């Protein structure tokens, strides 16, 4: 019979339209889905079953939700309407796509559309009892999560408050310590600056004195070098002069000695010619007497000088007395040659009793 059926007639279609329930929702046209969409829907369904959700939507944290959880729970509704039982008068097509022949081609009336929307709103307003139980479970879960989150938030706030208080206390203590340290550092810096100023002033004074002393030292060194050079030259000159003086005195002594030797030889020759023998002892005594007289004269002169220094007004009388005393022994001392006969002075210029002036000069030179 299915093969002989050719479709609905116009009368049958009219009758179906008249007998159709206005509150019955329009059957959705099935849409072919790809393999990826099917896998995705399957994964979403598994995840919703794990989390206890029926509609397959992933659960979110309360702080991630944009609206209140109750409104979200109330807004959820079953998207797939209950399938309408096919009437015996509406057979399916042989192709299996679910389309009724002739229905898609005919336009739908606006009254039917309004009745369809009213039926949907009635379904939303009157949910099934299973949905209510699930909503209550969701609300309880969300409330428990919300309370846990609130407790955690309170704990975190208390911890943050304590941490802030500790940080403020630590900052205050550190600031006090830093202020005390800065005060100490400033005081130490001032003391060091004062010491540096004192040291710098002392160093400046000492440097000026050192510069002055170095200049004076350089002048003294130059003068010392000049004096040393002059001293060395003077010493060398003195040494040369002393050497020349010694040489000249030696030469003079040798000349005088040679002259005296010649005189002695000459006198011996003359005495031999005159057959006169010289008394050597008398000559020696005469020389000693002359030396004593000279020594007495020198002592008298020294005494006169000392007396003049002590008492200058009476110096003339004392000097006259000393001169008289010195003259008296000269008068009283007789010459040994006058006592002997044949030794008196004669007209002969070469007599032995008359001393030679050259011999006197020689004796004076030897005495000096």
Swiss-Prot record:
Residues 11-27, 114-133 have a biased composition (Basic and acidic residues). One of its GO terms (cellular component) is cytoplasm. GO terms for biological process: hair follicle morphogenesis; non-motile cilium assembly; positive regulation of smoothened signaling pathway. It holds the Pfam family Transcrip_act. Expressed in small intestine, kidney, skeletal muscle, lung, spleen, brain and heart. High expression is observed in osteoblasts and skin; also expressed in osteoclasts albeit at lower levels. It is found in: Cytoplasm; Golgi apparatus. Keywords: Coiled coil, Cytoplasm, Golgi apparatus. The keyword Coiled coil applies. InterPro entries: GORAB. Residues 1-43, 55-133, 302-368 are annotated as: Disordered. Residues 145-310 form a coiled coil. It comes from the Eukaryota. Residues 188-368 are annotated as: Necessary for interaction with RCHY1. Residues 80-89 have a biased composition (Pro residues). Interacts with RCHY1. Interacts with SCYL1 and RAB6A/RAB6. Belongs to the GORAB family. This is RAB6-interacting golgin. It comes from Mus musculus. The gene is Gorab.
